[in-house]
Design a protein with these regions (language model features):
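Hinge/cleft segment of the Venus flytrap/periplasmic-binding protein
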Residues: 2, 139, 158-159, 253-294
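Hydrophobic alpha-helical
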Residues: 66-85, 155, 166, 170-241
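Extracytoplasmic "Venus flytrap"
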Residues: 1-22, 26-30, 34-50, 67-71, ...
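Short beta-strand elements in bilobed, periplasmic/extracellular small-molecule ligand-binding domains
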Residues: 28-43, 135-138, 159-178, 225-226
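Short, solvent-exposed amphipathic alpha-helices that sit
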Residues: 15-30, 118-122, 146-163, 176-180, ...
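Hydrophobic alpha-helical segments within soluble ligand-binding/sensing domains
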Residues: 46, 109-136, 177, 181, ...
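Flexible loop/hinge segments that line or gate small-molecule binding clefts
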Residues: 76-117, 236-241
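Short acidic/histidine-rich motifs immediately flanking catalytic phosphotransfer sites
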Residues: 50-64, 190-196
Length: 294
Protein backbone atom coordinates (compact mmCIF):
# COMPACT_ATOMS: atom_id res chain seq x y z
CA UNK A 1 0.00 0.00 0.00
CA UNK A 2 1.31 3.43 -0.97
CA UNK A 3 1.37 6.18 1.63
CA UNK A 4 1.41 9.92 0.89
CA UNK A 5 1.75 12.98 3.11
CA UNK A 6 -0.32 16.00 2.01
CA UNK A 7 0.93 19.29 3.48
CA UNK A 8 -1.49 22.21 3.18
CA UNK A 9 -1.09 25.86 4.12
CA UNK A 10 -3.95 26.19 6.62
CA UNK A 11 -7.15 24.61 7.86
CA UNK A 12 -8.79 28.04 8.24
CA UNK A 13 -9.89 28.33 4.61
CA UNK A 14 -12.68 26.47 2.82
CA UNK A 15 -10.58 25.73 -0.27
CA UNK A 16 -7.79 24.18 1.81
CA UNK A 17 -10.42 22.18 3.68
CA UNK A 18 -11.72 20.95 0.32
CA UNK A 19 -8.15 20.11 -0.72
CA UNK A 20 -7.88 17.92 2.38
CA UNK A 21 -11.28 16.26 1.84
CA UNK A 22 -10.51 15.59 -1.82
CA UNK A 23 -7.14 14.08 -0.90
CA UNK A 24 -8.69 11.73 1.64
CA UNK A 25 -11.50 10.71 -0.73
CA UNK A 26 -9.04 10.07 -3.58
CA UNK A 27 -6.77 8.06 -1.30
CA UNK A 28 -9.70 5.90 -0.20
CA UNK A 29 -10.78 5.37 -3.82
CA UNK A 30 -7.28 4.38 -4.95
CA UNK A 31 -6.27 2.42 -1.84
CA UNK A 32 -3.60 4.93 -0.80
CA UNK A 33 -2.87 5.95 2.78
CA UNK A 34 -3.20 9.75 3.15
CA UNK A 35 -1.85 11.80 6.06
CA UNK A 36 -2.92 15.47 5.90
CA UNK A 37 -0.91 18.04 7.87
CA UNK A 38 -1.31 21.82 8.08
CA UNK A 39 1.34 24.53 8.31
CA UNK A 40 -0.89 27.22 9.86
CA UNK A 41 0.35 29.72 7.24
CA UNK A 42 3.88 29.40 8.70
CA UNK A 43 6.62 28.73 6.13
CA UNK A 44 9.20 27.76 8.78
CA UNK A 45 6.78 25.32 10.39
CA UNK A 46 6.03 23.72 7.01
CA UNK A 47 9.73 23.34 6.20
CA UNK A 48 10.43 21.80 9.61
CA UNK A 49 7.45 19.43 9.36
CA UNK A 50 8.47 18.12 5.95
CA UNK A 51 12.18 17.87 6.72
CA UNK A 52 11.42 15.74 9.78
CA UNK A 53 9.24 13.45 7.66
CA UNK A 54 11.96 13.08 5.01
CA UNK A 55 14.70 12.42 7.59
CA UNK A 56 12.66 10.10 9.83
CA UNK A 57 14.71 6.96 10.60
CA UNK A 58 11.70 4.65 10.50
CA UNK A 59 8.59 5.04 8.36
CA UNK A 60 8.85 7.26 5.30
CA UNK A 61 6.02 8.05 2.89
CA UNK A 62 6.16 7.10 -0.79
CA UNK A 63 5.29 10.67 -1.75
CA UNK A 64 4.88 14.19 -0.40
CA UNK A 65 2.28 16.53 -1.92
CA UNK A 66 2.46 20.07 -0.61
CA UNK A 67 1.16 23.57 -1.17
CA UNK A 68 3.92 26.02 -0.18
CA UNK A 69 3.27 28.75 2.36
CA UNK A 70 6.46 30.57 1.35
CA UNK A 71 9.19 29.21 -0.90
CA UNK A 72 8.95 25.88 -2.72
CA UNK A 73 11.51 24.39 -0.26
CA UNK A 74 14.24 23.36 -2.73
CA UNK A 75 16.53 21.84 -0.06
CA UNK A 76 13.75 19.71 1.40
CA UNK A 77 12.80 18.69 -2.15
CA UNK A 78 16.35 17.50 -2.86
CA UNK A 79 16.46 15.58 0.40
CA UNK A 80 13.16 13.89 -0.51
CA UNK A 81 14.43 12.96 -3.97
CA UNK A 82 17.63 11.55 -2.47
CA UNK A 83 15.51 9.44 -0.11
CA UNK A 84 13.43 8.13 -3.01
CA UNK A 85 10.29 10.01 -1.97
CA UNK A 86 8.00 11.38 -4.69
CA UNK A 87 7.59 15.18 -4.57
CA UNK A 88 4.58 17.13 -5.85
CA UNK A 89 4.10 20.89 -5.54
CA UNK A 90 0.61 22.40 -5.61
CA UNK A 91 -0.21 25.83 -7.00
CA UNK A 92 3.38 26.81 -7.63
CA UNK A 93 5.99 26.59 -10.36
CA UNK A 94 9.44 25.57 -9.13
CA UNK A 95 12.61 25.99 -11.17
CA UNK A 96 14.23 23.00 -9.49
CA UNK A 97 11.71 20.41 -10.80
CA UNK A 98 13.76 19.51 -13.94
CA UNK A 99 16.86 18.98 -11.77
CA UNK A 100 14.87 16.86 -9.34
CA UNK A 101 13.59 14.70 -12.18
CA UNK A 102 17.18 14.07 -13.30
CA UNK A 103 18.39 13.17 -9.79
CA UNK A 104 16.68 9.84 -9.34
CA UNK A 105 13.75 7.58 -9.98
CA UNK A 106 11.23 9.17 -7.59
CA UNK A 107 8.63 11.17 -9.56
CA UNK A 108 8.49 14.94 -9.12
CA UNK A 109 6.10 17.42 -10.74
CA UNK A 110 3.67 20.27 -10.07
CA UNK A 111 -0.12 20.52 -10.23
CA UNK A 112 -1.66 23.96 -10.20
CA UNK A 113 -4.87 25.82 -10.62
CA UNK A 114 -4.59 28.13 -13.63
CA UNK A 115 -4.24 31.30 -11.58
CA UNK A 116 -3.80 33.59 -14.57
CA UNK A 117 -7.09 32.31 -16.01
CA UNK A 118 -8.78 32.66 -12.61
CA UNK A 119 -7.79 36.33 -12.61
CA UNK A 120 -8.99 36.76 -16.19
CA UNK A 121 -12.39 35.38 -15.21
CA UNK A 122 -12.56 37.80 -12.27
CA UNK A 123 -11.82 40.68 -14.66
CA UNK A 124 -14.57 39.50 -17.00
CA UNK A 125 -16.98 39.26 -14.04
CA UNK A 126 -16.20 42.92 -13.30
CA UNK A 127 -17.04 43.78 -16.90
CA UNK A 128 -20.32 41.84 -16.71
CA UNK A 129 -21.43 43.29 -13.36
CA UNK A 130 -20.25 46.86 -14.04
CA UNK A 131 -21.16 47.57 -17.69
CA UNK A 132 -20.67 51.31 -17.07
CA UNK A 133 -17.43 50.84 -15.12
CA UNK A 134 -16.82 51.92 -11.55
CA UNK A 135 -14.65 51.52 -8.47
CA UNK A 136 -13.72 48.04 -7.27
CA UNK A 137 -12.15 47.08 -3.95
CA UNK A 138 -9.91 44.12 -4.84
CA UNK A 139 -8.73 41.95 -1.94
CA UNK A 140 -5.59 40.01 -2.82
CA UNK A 141 -3.71 37.19 -1.17
CA UNK A 142 -0.26 37.72 0.39
CA UNK A 143 2.15 40.02 -1.47
CA UNK A 144 4.80 37.32 -1.92
CA UNK A 145 2.38 34.62 -3.06
CA UNK A 146 2.71 33.69 -6.76
CA UNK A 147 -0.95 32.61 -7.01
CA UNK A 148 -2.07 36.02 -5.76
CA UNK A 149 0.29 37.77 -8.19
CA UNK A 150 -0.92 35.71 -11.17
CA UNK A 151 -4.59 36.25 -10.30
CA UNK A 152 -3.98 40.00 -10.12
CA UNK A 153 -2.15 39.94 -13.45
CA UNK A 154 -4.99 38.03 -15.11
CA UNK A 155 -7.61 40.41 -13.69
CA UNK A 156 -5.70 43.42 -15.02
CA UNK A 157 -5.65 41.83 -18.49
CA UNK A 158 -9.43 41.58 -18.81
CA UNK A 159 -11.00 44.26 -16.62
CA UNK A 160 -12.44 47.22 -18.55
CA UNK A 161 -10.38 50.42 -18.61
CA UNK A 162 -13.22 52.27 -16.87
CA UNK A 163 -12.98 49.96 -13.84
CA UNK A 164 -10.65 51.44 -11.21
CA UNK A 165 -9.02 49.12 -8.68
CA UNK A 166 -8.21 49.78 -5.02
CA UNK A 167 -6.17 46.86 -3.65
CA UNK A 168 -6.21 45.52 -0.09
CA UNK A 169 -4.16 42.60 1.25
CA UNK A 170 -5.42 39.46 2.96
CA UNK A 171 -4.02 36.06 3.97
CA UNK A 172 -6.55 33.76 2.26
CA UNK A 173 -8.74 33.82 5.41
CA UNK A 174 -12.04 35.48 6.31
CA UNK A 175 -10.56 37.13 9.40
CA UNK A 176 -7.62 38.68 7.53
CA UNK A 177 -9.94 40.27 4.95
CA UNK A 178 -12.30 41.41 7.68
CA UNK A 179 -9.45 43.26 9.42
CA UNK A 180 -8.13 44.77 6.17
CA UNK A 181 -11.58 45.97 5.09
CA UNK A 182 -12.54 47.22 8.56
CA UNK A 183 -9.35 49.30 8.75
CA UNK A 184 -9.92 50.73 5.28
CA UNK A 185 -13.59 51.53 5.95
CA UNK A 186 -12.64 53.66 8.95
CA UNK A 187 -10.48 56.01 6.85
CA UNK A 188 -12.27 59.35 6.18
CA UNK A 189 -11.10 59.26 2.56
CA UNK A 190 -12.61 55.79 2.11
CA UNK A 191 -15.99 56.85 3.46
CA UNK A 192 -16.22 59.52 0.78
CA UNK A 193 -15.38 57.05 -1.99
CA UNK A 194 -18.01 55.38 -4.13
CA UNK A 195 -17.65 51.59 -4.07
CA UNK A 196 -19.37 49.80 -6.95
CA UNK A 197 -18.06 46.29 -6.32
CA UNK A 198 -15.93 44.25 -3.90
CA UNK A 199 -13.95 41.39 -5.42
CA UNK A 200 -11.69 39.02 -3.48
CA UNK A 201 -9.22 36.37 -4.56
CA UNK A 202 -11.04 33.76 -2.52
CA UNK A 203 -14.56 33.34 -1.16
CA UNK A 204 -13.56 33.43 2.50
CA UNK A 205 -11.95 36.86 2.02
CA UNK A 206 -15.06 38.09 0.19
CA UNK A 207 -17.16 37.05 3.19
CA UNK A 208 -14.74 38.73 5.60
CA UNK A 209 -14.92 41.97 3.62
CA UNK A 210 -18.71 41.80 3.57
CA UNK A 211 -18.84 41.28 7.33
CA UNK A 212 -16.65 44.37 7.85
CA UNK A 213 -19.06 46.44 5.74
CA UNK A 214 -22.08 45.04 7.61
CA UNK A 215 -20.53 46.27 10.88
CA UNK A 216 -19.57 49.70 9.52
CA UNK A 217 -21.26 53.06 10.10
CA UNK A 218 -24.89 52.84 8.82
CA UNK A 219 -24.37 55.44 6.09
CA UNK A 220 -21.39 53.50 4.71
CA UNK A 221 -23.00 50.11 5.31
CA UNK A 222 -26.20 50.83 3.42
CA UNK A 223 -24.34 52.34 0.48
CA UNK A 224 -21.70 49.64 0.08
CA UNK A 225 -23.83 46.57 0.80
CA UNK A 226 -25.78 47.40 -2.35
CA UNK A 227 -22.60 46.65 -4.35
CA UNK A 228 -21.95 43.12 -5.64
CA UNK A 229 -19.39 41.01 -3.76
CA UNK A 230 -17.48 38.32 -5.68
CA UNK A 231 -14.99 35.68 -4.65
CA UNK A 232 -13.10 32.67 -5.86
CA UNK A 233 -12.86 28.91 -5.12
CA UNK A 234 -16.55 28.23 -5.73
CA UNK A 235 -16.95 25.11 -3.64
CA UNK A 236 -20.42 23.53 -3.94
CA UNK A 237 -21.40 23.88 -0.26
CA UNK A 238 -19.82 27.30 0.38
CA UNK A 239 -19.01 29.66 -2.50
CA UNK A 240 -21.66 28.37 -4.90
CA UNK A 241 -24.21 28.20 -2.08
CA UNK A 242 -23.42 31.81 -1.11
CA UNK A 243 -24.12 32.84 -4.71
CA UNK A 244 -27.47 31.03 -4.63
CA UNK A 245 -28.34 32.82 -1.37
CA UNK A 246 -27.39 36.21 -2.82
CA UNK A 247 -24.54 36.76 -0.34
CA UNK A 248 -22.07 36.74 -3.24
CA UNK A 249 -22.89 37.88 -6.77
CA UNK A 250 -20.42 35.48 -8.37
CA UNK A 251 -17.44 33.23 -7.72
CA UNK A 252 -14.82 31.38 -9.75
CA UNK A 253 -14.99 27.59 -9.44
CA UNK A 254 -11.49 26.20 -8.82
CA UNK A 255 -11.33 22.38 -8.72
CA UNK A 256 -9.20 20.97 -5.85
CA UNK A 257 -5.89 19.85 -7.32
CA UNK A 258 -5.00 17.26 -4.68
CA UNK A 259 -7.14 14.77 -6.63
CA UNK A 260 -5.10 15.20 -9.82
CA UNK A 261 -1.83 15.19 -7.85
CA UNK A 262 -2.59 11.89 -6.10
CA UNK A 263 -3.84 10.21 -9.29
CA UNK A 264 -0.70 11.27 -11.20
CA UNK A 265 1.64 10.22 -8.38
CA UNK A 266 0.01 6.79 -8.07
CA UNK A 267 0.24 6.33 -11.85
CA UNK A 268 3.91 7.31 -11.83
CA UNK A 269 4.90 5.04 -8.92
CA UNK A 270 2.69 2.03 -9.68
CA UNK A 271 2.74 2.06 -13.49
CA UNK A 272 6.00 3.84 -14.24
CA UNK A 273 4.22 6.55 -16.23
CA UNK A 274 6.33 9.70 -16.53
CA UNK A 275 4.21 12.66 -15.37
CA UNK A 276 4.13 16.09 -16.96
CA UNK A 277 6.31 18.66 -15.21
CA UNK A 278 3.21 20.85 -14.72
CA UNK A 279 -0.47 19.96 -14.94
CA UNK A 280 -3.17 22.67 -14.79
CA UNK A 281 -6.78 22.40 -13.64
CA UNK A 282 -9.46 24.47 -15.42
CA UNK A 283 -11.47 27.19 -13.58
CA UNK A 284 -14.92 28.48 -14.56
CA UNK A 285 -17.28 31.33 -13.66
CA UNK A 286 -20.32 30.68 -11.45
CA UNK A 287 -22.82 31.80 -12.61
CA UNK A 288 -21.61 31.76 -16.20
CA UNK A 289 -20.46 35.07 -17.66
CA UNK A 290 -23.46 34.98 -20.02
CA UNK A 291 -25.87 34.81 -17.07
CA UNK A 292 -24.02 37.60 -15.25
CA UNK A 293 -24.40 39.91 -18.24
CA UNK A 294 -28.22 39.60 -18.21
Amino acid sequence: MLNFVVSLTTNDNDYQQEQASAAEATGKRLGVGIQVIHADNDAFKQSDQLLKIVQAPGFRPDGIIFEPVGTALPQVAKAAAAAGIGWVILNREAEYIPELRRMGTAPSFAVSSNHLEIGRIQGLQMAALLPKGGNVIYIQGPSDNPAAKQRTMGMQQTKPVNVKITSLKGQWTEESAYKAMASWVRLPTSQRQMVDMVSAQDDSMALGARRAVEEADPAVRDKWLAAPFTGCDGLPKTGQEDVRKGILAATVVVPPNTTTAIEMLVDAISNGKKPLEMALTVPSSFPTLTKLQK
